[in-house]
């Protein structure tokens, strides 16, 4: 799909960095003063600003003496796994002796604190149930537990429904009555804040002193991993959490499981970036919840012996390889469906709805994301569960709030969607198979009402051109050092015109393009690589010049470090 390369506007304002390039990058990301660049823990928001935190802390204080059975119920993604592991570790460090956890199986119980999951917790003897990264939409499960006289503490970050579950306490920055400034906390961030508040209460009660209290900065590796892997916007507070965790990972002050996953991914933790967490560690951890059971991922993060961590990391790596194979097949089928839709309607629908009965439920979200990236359309991919219900995973584009779209469809067609939930850019839902054709039409029409043609034009936003003297390792190191980059605080991407002096396909499937480039202004020769190219278009030796969108990357090979351009998009220039 042809895309537009556009440059980010740099707002007029005071300088925020003495370095001209950094000043440009920061202001393009709406940084207005140097305080917003502070990544120290002292600048972290206070837990007491979270609505419901006092009630939540009191529930845990009451469960401390006499010791009550606490069961943590997590989610089956990386945010859920890190939230679960963090809560188990923190509560045990605080002195809670009877802490257990449950992670619903995607294929058996589905998402959230359902009644079957509540029954599993009761079998474990639960006296206080605490959700992490889920629960705000789990009305039935919470009500079921309350009827049994069991107290429930919900911690979540997902957008709440109109009717909240009848929990004893709910901590969620997205509650309408919550004034917490950072609405982008991941589930693991919410859990971390609750544990900080409990520790503070225990100090107040004399259970700990400042000297004897557990050091919860040791849990920031989990906070960083869950925050980056869940692709939540990196506002200043999340940047602090992610950066502090990343620094601890680089110093190897982290879970053995993270080190083991880095080993199987052939990554050096001492050089870790947020991209490594998001694209190497996160997918392997997520593979457990996609194809098997996320308990594998939680056990990896709880492992205190390297041999056990390595064993589980190898299991996750194999699951991830299997996931890639399943994904490749599903993506080909999805592209074929899109081609058929285009042939049928003369153009691709504004909102793409895909369904194959035998598709793997655990891989739907990735396929939706891949098709969304390829066609720049909102996408929902469905598969059938064991009871004949269609489970869907939705991914959106800028300008379309996916959960709001589903809310509108639900309000206008109350019997269409069985249940749904999510965020602006990602959501999940269930419908009946007989409603698929109607839903396909309604979703497309709703998206068409919401978006115009301009929204459907894929755009690559860049930070403009680099000068010849900026193509060096020092610039790449500088950009790496001032991250943490991610969602809402994007890694710098540049554009410019280049001569293509050499190009060749590389990789096992010959789907990566290696190039030798010279900037239009001359002065330097540059190695470049473009991953996952369209092999029907490239290599093309007739293309001698192109405008490229690219990032700076440090290529390390056999102890040597060199600059490499990581090319995101190629726009050929006619000579």
Curated annotation (Swiss-Prot):
Primary enzyme class: hydrolase
Biological role stated in the UniProt entry: Single-stranded-DNA-specific exonuclease. Required for many types of recombinational events, although the stringency of the requirement for RecJ appears to vary with the type of recombinational event monitored and the other recombination gene products which are available. Involved in genome maintenance but probably not in phase variation, which contributes to the virulence and disease.
GO biological process, one term: DNA repair
The family this protein is said to belong to: Belongs to the RecJ family.
Source organism: Haemophilus influenzae (strain ATCC 51907 / DSM 11121 / KW20 / Rd)
Source organism phylogeny: Bacteria, Pseudomonadati, Pseudomonadota, Gammaproteobacteria, Pasteurellales
InterPro entries (alphabetical): DDH_dom, DHH_sf, DHHA1_dom, RecJ, RecJ_OB, SSDNA_exonuclease_RecJ
EC numbers: 3.1.-.-
A molecular function (GO) term: single-stranded DNA 5'-3' DNA exonuclease activity
Phenotype caused by lack of the gene: Slightly decreased growth rate, higher sensitivity to UV light, slight increase in sensitivity to mitomycin C treatment, no change in the spontaneous mutation rate, no change in the rates of slippage in tetranucleotide repeat tracts (i.e. phase variation). A double exoI-recJ deletion strain has a 2.5-fold increase in spontaneous mutations.
Protein name: Single-stranded-DNA-specific exonuclease RecJ
Keywords: Exonuclease, Hydrolase, Nuclease
